[in-house]
Design a protein with these regions (language model features):
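Surface-exposed amphipathic alpha-helical segments
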Residues: 153-187
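N-terminal "mature-domain start" segment
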Residues: 19-56
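Short, solvent-exposed recognition patches
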Residues: 84-106
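Secretory pathway targeting signatures of secreted, lumenal, and periplasmic proteins
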Residues: 43-84
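Sec-dependent N-terminal signal peptides
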Residues: 4-13
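Signature of long, low-cysteine stretches enriched in small and polar/charged residues
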Residues: 98-148
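C-terminal segment of classical bacterial N-terminal signal peptides
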Residues: 14-18
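Short, cysteine-centered beta-strand-loop-beta hairpins and adjacent loop/turn segments enriched
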Residues: 63-66, 131-141, 153, 168-169
Length: 187
């Protein structure tokens, strides 16, 4: 009787340890990695704490590439946070405005939540922002938003799949972003 009970306890302990392990996004060949604390240095006014992971394809800065401004961002934040539209818009606006520096006025950034979700499930966001790195123009990016709160670890996990390509589930860029990163983040 003792052995089955001990086995159950061991399984529970191991599964609890696995649940507390932070998620690590994969790094495809030739993609650039950025892992940092949250809020990032350019958006210190944001109140939430945790980490972010970004993965950039080799052609991220090539305005002629389909992968221009196409990348995932994984947030792992402490607490049940960014729970509503107002907080989500604030997080995106402060992040983008800080990223653009003084090159583009914050009030010109437009963030719109679409009424029709991506893949009939995930909220879609349209971000009319700015490219401070390559073109100094205002590309429109589509963002597929994934969020969950894990009570056991008191962690909010958010995955943003972002691209300058209009969202189309048959588009190769969107297929790549979904295939490489969605399941690794647990969505």
């Amino acid at each position: 009787m003792f052995k089955p009970f001990a086995l159950v306890l061991l399984i529970l302990a191991v599964s609890q340890l696995q649940a507390t392990e932070p998620i690590k996004l994969p790094v495809p060949a030739e993609w650039r990695v950025e892992n940092t604390s949250y809020p990032p240095p350019w958006a210190q006014t944001l109140p939430w704490k945790g980490t972010i992971q970004l993965r950039f394809p080799k052609s991220f800065f090539d305005s002629d590439s389909d992968y221009f401004w196409s990348y995932p961002i994984l947030y792992q934040l402490r607490g049940d946070v960014i729970t509503n539209t107002k907080e989500l818009k604030r997080a995106l606006l402060e992040y983008d405005a800080g990223l653009y520096g003084n090159k583009y006025p914050k009030e010109n950034i437009k963030i719109t939540l679409r009424t029709r979700p991506a893949d009939q499930r995930y909220p879609m966001i349209i971000d009319d922002g700015f490219d401070p790195f390559t073109t100094n123009k205002q590309p429109r990016t589509s963002i597929v938003y994934h969020r969950r709160y894990e009570k056991q670890t008191d962690t909010t996990t958010i995955l943003l799949l972002r691209s300058s390509q209009p969202y189309d589930p048959e588009n190769d860029v969107w297929k790549t972003l979904r295939t490489l990163f969605r399941s690794h983040a647990g969505f």
